[in-house]
Amino acid sequence: MELITLLSALLVLAIVSLSTFFVLYYNTPTKDGKTLPPGRMGWPFIGESYDFFAAGWKGKPESFIFDRLKKFAKGNLNGQFRTSLFGNKSIVVAGAAANKLLFSNEKKLVTMWWPPSIDKAFPSTAQLSANEEALLMRKFFPSFLIRREALQRYIPIMDDCTRRHFATGAWGPSDKIEAFNVTQDYTFWVACRVFMSIDAQEDPETVDSLFRHFNVLKAGIYSMHIDLPWTNFHHAMKASHAIRSAVEQIAKKRRAELAEGKAFPTQDMLSYMLETPITSAEDSKDGKAKYLNDADIGTKILGLLVGGHDTSSTVIAFFFKFMAENPHVYEAIYKEQMEVAATKAPGELLNWDDLQKMKYSWCAICEVMRLTPPVQGAFRQAITDFTHNGYLIPKGWKIYWSTHSTHRNPEIFPQPEKFDPTRFEGNGPPAFSFVPFGGGPRMCPGKEYARLQVLTFVHHIVTKFKWEQILPNEKIIVSPMPYPEKNLPLRMIARSESATLA
């Protein structure tokens, strides 16, 4: 018995000693005699990933950053600290100057980096990383997501989708709707119509199936890379495969329709991908143009669905929340939107010029994105050693920038918790401080797409309804995008009814 007790004590001592050694070694503050930013690396393999996720689960993703800036950067909101995230040695940077450094030095000091779960969710037959895939996709963006003439084509489509979604009665009037869920459904309708010309009312089975898998994918796409049957990551990978397989079949059908003249090359992003070579005949070694195959088209359309859906749905959902909490802002938007409506004939669809008149509405939407940005931040990878604020950022380390480090910085946005659309009037906030879409050459190419969709929706919702929050203090969870814990239940009141009640 004494021998067993002694051996047990020695085993515990060995484990504690070994763990202490690993922690001390793993948290070494220097590299080749050069000073790394202060911080802590957490435990081997895990690092501080759990703390990173837990801050979002508590609805305060910014606390992970601000708490460590307070401890390791003496409260400097433009500082930095080292940590370990997603199994990688990382440095978290904060402030507009850091944003400018990263956004302005793509391929010079840094390159884009995605967690392993992203590479798995968006596979390429050419064995490209998610970063390389993103660069390839930018070949297609100008013709469909950036140029004004392309964007103008979307507005009537978005308007028509919005009117038809309202006609389903999903928005009320009602004593209770779960606004977050209805918003998710609406924005997926629009994405399927714009990117693949799939009409949710004409082909509800396809859209519903894609949407079910899509929600599973979103729940695990940014989770820890642990592929076991019960993990969110495992379920997300299965959902990714299901969506990509479905899109491949849609692409095969569209290819036949293009050959028969039943579809046209500029119809939507799907047709454009099928008809546009990624390598011209002149640049090809065999003198033949190279096109995307169906599998890679499935991956790229999936990426568009994620990007085109999540930003808009998140912004619209929290627009409801902040308008309910700030009725004076809602009334100012209502006045502006009624002025636009007064210029339209009955049934006439919105156009580009109409949306340009919605200036205050867009200021309010920007304030929504400041307080609840759809994207919390992103990673870069250092491709060479360089310094920032006097500290070494070593080659190969990951660098994380966060929207919250500037969006909630009181030195940039006084009273940062206050909802105030006037912050965006005139010249707006300083450069590199408002970054819901990132910045530099890696700025989200869907920024204008999201702007058009959200403004189109705002026009219809405020001219038809007022609303009240049923749970004013509902908890907000961020994982990885913000969402209300109880799906934002609202009482929807028709404008005519609200006038009668008044």
Curated annotation (Swiss-Prot):
UniProt-annotated location(s): Membrane
Glycosylation sites: N88, N181
Tissue-by-tissue expression: Mainly expressed in flowers and flower buds, to a lesser extent in young leaves and, at low levels, in old leaves, stems and roots.
EC primary class: oxidoreductase
Functional pathway: Secondary metabolite biosynthesis; terpenoid biosynthesis
Cofactor(s) needed for function: heme
Pfam families: p450
Technological use: Soapwort saponins possess anticancer properties and are also being explored as enhancers for endosomal escape in targeted tumor therapies. They may also serve as precursors for vaccine adjuvants.
Tagged with keyword Membrane: yes
Superkingdom of origin: Eukaryota
Chain sites annotated for binding heme: C444
Chain's role: Component of the oleanane-type triterpene saponins (e.g. saponarioside A and saponarioside B) biosynthetic pathway, leading to the production of natural products with detergent properties used as traditional sources of soap.
Full protein name: Beta-amyrin 28-monooxygenase CYP716A379
Source organism (scientific name): Saponaria officinalis
